[in-house]
Design a protein with these regions (language model features):
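Conserved small-residue packing positions in alpha-helical repeats and bundles
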Residues: 1-2, 99
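Short, Lys/Arg-enriched, Trp-marked, Pro/Gly-tolerant hinge/linker segments that flank
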Residues: 3-68, 81-89, 93
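ATP/adenylate-binding site constellation spanning eukaryotic-like Ser/Thr protein kinases
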Residues: 18, 96, 133
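Proline-centered helix-kink/hinge sites
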Residues: 87, 135-136
């Protein structure tokens, strides 16, 4: 499980590095428009589908670049431009949405953490509270057992 946490951190660090590099290049070399091939929303749609399908697994920018057929730099730039958030942030929203559904079905907290790609319950709880504003336990108490 520690590997998942480590790979998530590496993914986020690489993403931030590439965003900063892109900003430096734009600031010092002028904005270069993306070639038409990079503007195709189906490439980004394929990345979104991949992230949804593999949300409980470690994911890297290299993998996402292969899915889209783009370099990781162009993928990051194009994805962020089209979606308004980075691929990592998009993955986080998928994981939390999945966690919310599982908590509403009264799935045990440790199972929710593992099914949504978190290394342990503690990491999941901190992350969930940061994004949602309540702990997973509080969320489950409020929304758990409701029938749709």
């Amino acid at each position: 499980h520690a590997m998942i946490v480590q790979e998530d951190k590496e993914f986020r660090k690489e993403e931030i590095f590439l965003m900063l590099l892109g900003q430096l290049l734009r600031d010092n070399a002028g904005e270069t428009p993306l070639p038409d091939a990079y503007k195709d929303e189906s490439d980004i749609g394929a990345v979104c589908a991949y992230l949804e399908e593999h949300s409980g697994e470690p994911v890297s920018l290299d993998q996402l670049g292969e899915v889209a057929g783009l370099s990781k730099y162009y993928l990051l730039r194009s994805f962020t431009k089209q979606k308004g958030i980075s691929p990592y942030r998009y993955l986080e929203t998928i994981r939390i949405a999945k966690a919310r559904k599982l908590l509403e079905r009264n799935v045990p907290m440790i199972e929710v953490a593992l099914q949504t790609g978190f290394a342990d319950q503690s990491h999941f709880s901190r992350f969930f509270k940061r994004l949602i504003g309540v702990t997973p336990r509080q969320y489950a108490e409020i929304f758990g057992g409701r029938q749709a």
